[in-house]
Swiss-Prot record:
It catalyses: aldehydo-D-galactose 6-phosphate = keto-D-tagatose 6-phosphate. One of its GO terms (molecular function) is ribose-5-phosphate isomerase activity. Pathway: Carbohydrate metabolism; D-galactose 6-phosphate degradation; D-tagatose 6-phosphate from D-galactose 6-phosphate: step 1/1. Belongs to the LacAB/RpiB family. Keywords: Isomerase, Lactose metabolism. This is Galactose-6-phosphate isomerase subunit LacA. The keyword Isomerase applies.
Length: 142
């Protein structure tokens, strides 16, 4: 699976920890911020563009609180994103909402929780069915 990641200065340490996990577990990792982006807007826009251009890719944006990257991602047409700080939400946003990007705040979750969030997000798959109506509504909005 192809996973696109990126971070601003506040999310860099957590991003690098998750990157190591992804590489160790044979994910294809595209790091859009080998060096920290000056602002979460830059890193999140880079992630969203890549995810849109590469069907089937998933993205993870890291910043201080997750909210900034979330706001940016949801402004991009074709992107469904969720700010998550727990494992269940990470899983369900893929399964029911077909989210292609999650945002994680490094000042909100620690490294162990972040790792579990990423695992759940990447293990989940979209159910479709009755949830497609919601996804279609979201895609019409942005």
């Amino acid at each position: 699976m192809r996973v696109v990641i990126g971070a601003d200065k506040e999310g860099m340490e957590l991003k690098n920890m998750i990157k190591c996990y992804l590489l160790e577990n044979n994910f294809e990792v595209i790091d859009k911020s080998e060096e920290a982006s000056e602002d979460f807007v830059e890193s999140t826009v880079a992630i969203t563009k890549d995810v849109l251009e590469n069907k089937g890719s998933l993205g993870i944006a890291f910043d201080g609180y997750g909210a900034g990257s979330f706001m940016v991602a949801t402004k991009i047409k074709g992107i469904i994103a969720a700010e998550v700080s727990d494992e269940r939400s990470a899983y369900m946003t893929r399964e029911h909402n077909n989210s292609s990007i999650i945002t994680i705040g490094s000042k909100i979750v620690g490294s162990e929780l972040a790792l579990n969030i990423v695992k759940e997000f990447l293990e989940a798959s979209y159910d479709g069915g009755r949830h497609q109506i919601r996804v279609d509504m979201l895609n019409k909005m942005a």
